């Protein structure tokens, strides 16, 4: 709907009826931006109409809007008028600020607070002396002398007069007695020195200031006089007049005696206290020394006790046996010349093709007469050598139990064969074809000062294969000669063995083979030809009739196997048939 024309708007606001038959009423236009809030109600036209008589009646919507604006304006006017009235009343009712009232917390008052002295002046101008003292204390920060407060020293007459008033106030119960109240004697007044000093009226110094306290002599004298007057039923004046100066002297003497007695008592108490503290201190020091000694002694005992117990209880450690590898051996250690049987040796071997047959053949080869030494050369490559301290003969009790799965039913010699404790050698090479011939070879001596036990015969299955060759070569059908003297100690030893004294040799089988050839001179060990061994030279009477058995140096022979790098340097026994 379009905006009404100005003429129509004027007719609506003025209340003139519209010529249109419908008489449509439009809302008033919105107020302008700079419309005054305190606007007045629009005046009606000067033309007298019938509607002017009913202006106050809300016959039209425009009257309701104007009334709302008018109510708002009236509320604002009332608020402004009320504020003005309250401000005027506050100014009228605000009294003059008293000196002792607190100042308002304004910036100016806070700035001048250091120089503000209204409270100080109020205290200073009061009538009470304590208030004035507090005022000066606040003003100057310290207690001033009475002269600063305006007080003057009193004369003697004023002091006496005040003293009488003070005595009246001090002894109100003695008013019924007849006579003056302890008048001073003229002699005492003339002298002026013996009259008891009484506290004067008026403050000489402010309370709390240093100085002599009030003399209690007069009080004590007055109490004594009153007590005497009550006891004798006379007035205190008569008592004082009768005693005269004797009372003062008695009081002085009594006071001196009391002072001396008190001083002596205090001195004795102090000395006893000091002695007691000194004694306690000495006792404490002694106790502390004892405690310190007691505390130190257990530490020394604790420090020395482990060593003493160790030296007393722990014997010298025995020489430990050589450390064994995981595989265990069940027999004592044998000398180097003895055959080396390892713990993993199976039970009796099968027929000759089995590699273990050579081992038993070596056992038979090393079955010479007792107490004879064999010299074995070192192999080309020495196996692992286990260095150990000197061995100790250990009983079989120390042998650990056999592991599970290992059989120990292998027939062993009558005299238990020593078994080495070194690391097992490398695997055996394939066997070589045997040949018939002699296998004697002179070898350099590498002896070990140990006796070789004589063992019983090996199983029959092995003896059958080597009897014809070994017994005929060794000539065991003759009685063996006595053993030669022991050779010098060896320079190197690859194994550490323990020895067991050999039992007497068992009877040996008889062999009709011819005696062995004479011994050969000592020569160095070396590989021999694979196919032929030269015969031995004729016997030499000047040569030591001892030969050396060296199976490891021979590569072939009847019933022998060549074993290289299998055993460490062994010691073999030599013997002679002559």
Curated annotation (Swiss-Prot):
Span list, region Disordered: 1-62, 173-216, 426-457, 474-578
Listed GO CC annotations: nuclear speck
Expression sites by tissue: Expressed in germline, oocytes, epidermis, pharyngeal bulb and neurons.
Record keywords: mRNA processing, Nucleus
Biased amino acid composition, Low complexity: 444-455, 565-578
GO biological process, one term: mRNA processing
Presence of keyword Nucleus: yes
Subcellular location: Nucleus; Nucleus speckle
Domain of life assignment: Eukaryota
Coiled coil feature spans: none
Protein role: Acts as a negative regulator of nuclear pre-mRNA 3'-end processing (mRNA polyadenylation). Plays a role in tissue-specific expression of protein isoforms by regulating differential processing of pre-mRNA 3'-end (alternative polyadenylation). In neurons, regulates alternative polyadenylation of specific mRNAs including unc-44 and dlk-1 by interacting with phosphatase ssup-72 and thus preventing ssup-72 dephosphorylation of RNA polymerase II subunit ama-1.
Protein's recorded name: Synaptic defective enhancer 1
Protein's organism: Caenorhabditis elegans
């Amino acid at each position: 709907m379009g905006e009404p024309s100005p003429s129509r708007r004027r007719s609506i606001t003025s209340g003139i009826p519209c010529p249109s038959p419908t008489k449509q009423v439009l809302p008033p236009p919105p107020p302008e931006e700079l419309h005054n809030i305190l606007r007045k109600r629009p005046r009606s036209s000067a033309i007298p109409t019938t509607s002017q008589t009913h202006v106050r009646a809300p016959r039209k919507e425009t009257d309701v809007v104007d009334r709302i604006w008018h109510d708002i304006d009236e509320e604002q006017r009332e608020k402004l008028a009320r504020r003005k009235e309250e401000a005027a009343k506050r100014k009228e009712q605000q009294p003059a600020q008293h000196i002792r009232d607190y100042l308002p917390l304004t910036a100016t008052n806070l700035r001048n607070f250091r120089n503000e002295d209204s409270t100080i002046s109020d205290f200073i101008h009061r009538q009470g002396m304590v208030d004035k003292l507090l005022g000066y204390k606040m003003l100057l920060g310290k207690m001033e002398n009475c002269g600063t407060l305006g007080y003057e020293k009193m004369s003697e007459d004023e002091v006496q007069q005040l003293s009488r008033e003070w005595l009246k106030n001090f002894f109100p119960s003695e008013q019924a007695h007849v006579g003056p109240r302890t008048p001073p004697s003229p002699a005492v007044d003339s002298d002026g020195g013996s009259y008891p000093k009484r506290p004067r009226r008026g403050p000489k110094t402010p309370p709390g200031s240093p100085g002599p306290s009030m003399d209690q002599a007069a009080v004590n004298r007055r109490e004594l006089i009153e007590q005497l007057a009550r006891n004798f039923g006379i007035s205190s004046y008569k008592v004082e007049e009768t005693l005269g100066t004797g009372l003062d002297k008695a009081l002085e003497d009594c006071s001196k005696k009391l002072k001396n007695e008190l001083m002596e008592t205090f001195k004795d108490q102090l000395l006893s206290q000091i002695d007691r503290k000194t004694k306690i201190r000495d006792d404490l020091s002694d106790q502390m020394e004892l405690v310190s000694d007691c505390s130190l002694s257990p530490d020394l005992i604790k420090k020395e006790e482990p060593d003493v117990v160790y030296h007393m209880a722990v014997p010298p450690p025995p020489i430990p046996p050589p450390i064994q590898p995981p595989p265990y051996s069940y027999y004592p250690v044998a000398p180097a010349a003895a055959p080396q049987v390892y713990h993993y040796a199976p039970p009796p071997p099968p027929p000759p093709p089995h590699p273990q047959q050579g081992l038993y053949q070596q056992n038979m080869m090393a079955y010479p007469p007792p107490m004879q030494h064999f010299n074995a050369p070192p192999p080309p490559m020495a196996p692992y050598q286990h260095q150990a301290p000197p061995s100790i003969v250990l009983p079989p009790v120390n042998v650990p139990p056999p592991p599970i799965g290992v059989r120990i039913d292998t027939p062993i010699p009558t005299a238990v064969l020593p078994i080495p404790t070194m690391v097992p050698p490398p695997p055996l090479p394939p066997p070589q074809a045997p040949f018939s011939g002699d296998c004697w070879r002179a070898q350099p001596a590498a002896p070990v000062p140990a006796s070789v036990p004589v063992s019983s015969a090996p199983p029959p299955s092995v003896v059958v294969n080597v009897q014809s060759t070994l017994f005929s070569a060794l000539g065991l059908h003759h009685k063996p000669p006595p053993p030669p003297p022991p050779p010098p100690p060896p320079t190197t030893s690859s194994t550490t063995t323990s020895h067991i004294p050999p039992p007497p040799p068992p009877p040996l089988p008889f062999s009709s083979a011819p005696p062995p050839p004479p011994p050969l001179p000592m020569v160095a060990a070396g590989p021999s030809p694979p196919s032929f061994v030269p015969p031995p030279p004729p016997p030499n009477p000047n040569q030591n009739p001892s030969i050396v058995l060296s199976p490891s140096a021979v590569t072939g022979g009847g019933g022998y196997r060549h074993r290289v790098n299998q055993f460490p340097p062994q010691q073999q026994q030599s013997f002679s048939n002559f």
